[in-house]
């Protein structure tokens, strides 16, 4: 298993949660990046408010750490309604979901993170709730059991997932607003780092914010985490101000290189290059070679490496690109 304290892992760490809440934007106008998504949401939200209706159900998908939870909260704020949050693995029984649904008020947002991990029995309850705002409940057991329907107030379900392909087709089809989040560019990440530094009361210059941003793997959660670690270095080794020099030395000390890679990324790429002659190599063989689970490679390590053009997926397996060889100052065989 990948180490839980990996500094640049995009998944939420315990220490991230409280700090990230303070840094989260509350409204769309405060939200940086994802321009197409923001533009779409502004239209959908304004239209729903003009009609005095609940916003259509929304599926937000993309790699971890890009702001799916933040967007769900912004939607609730923009609509002026409450939000109740849960996650797929927590909803083990139909009654767990029923308890949440029956406590919603008109227009409220129900946010389900990791919605691809809903159990089939819970998913079945969700279908009529999403389509008809009705809840089917079984009363009694055996031959005497009967179904009753409860009317629900109009509500908005916001589902978030890193694996949209793992959703069943019937569930996916019930979301009227699908939104894909992409990795952030360095300019937008620099803006996020600067804003977070202001919230934290830190002194940071443009070059310092840029240095942190370019090593943050296109992910705001990682950018904020690196900012906190660079702050520690700046306070202990310097005068507390974060410059390009300070950020560069701090991140080198933390073993986060100029591309935002750490030892796990380098281990993966070097395994393809050295052990499998650049590939192609199947996912199971690659997982065995680096001692990780295939899901970890698919969900955590690969997305950014593929997006940046360091490895490729092919029908025959993973291959290291010329850019991967260049990163290690190696010559790619012809």
Swiss-Prot record:
It comes from Shewanella sp. (strain W3-18-1). Its EC number is 3.6.4.-. This is Holliday junction branch migration complex subunit RuvB. One of its GO terms (biological process) is DNA recombination. It is found in: Cytoplasm. It catalyses: ATP + H2O = ADP + phosphate + H(+). InterPro entries: AAA+_ATPase, AAA_lid_4, DNA_helicase_Holl-junc_RuvB, P-loop_NTPase, RuvB-like_N, RuvB_C, WH-like_DNA-bd_sf, WH_DNA-bd_sf. It is an enzyme of class 3 (hydrolase). Gene3D superfamilies: 1.10.8.60, P-loop containing nucleotide triphosphate hydrolases, Winged helix-like DNA-binding domain superfamily/Winged helix DNA-binding domain. The RuvA-RuvB-RuvC complex processes Holliday junction (HJ) DNA during genetic recombination and DNA repair, while the RuvA-RuvB complex plays an important role in the rescue of blocked DNA replication forks via replication fork reversal (RFR). RuvA specifically binds to HJ cruciform DNA, conferring on it an open structure. The RuvB hexamer acts as an ATP-dependent pump, pulling dsDNA into and through the RuvAB complex. RuvB forms 2 homohexamers on either side of HJ DNA bound by 1 or 2 RuvA tetramers; 4 subunits per hexamer contact DNA at a time. One of its GO terms (molecular function) is four-way junction DNA binding. The keyword DNA damage applies. One of its GO terms (cellular component) is Holliday junction resolvase complex. DNA binds at residues 294, 313, 318. Its main location: cytoplasm. Residues 258-334 are annotated as: Head domain (RuvB-H). Residues 4-184 are annotated as: Large ATPase domain (RuvB-L). Mg(2+) binds at residue 69. Belongs to the RuvB family.
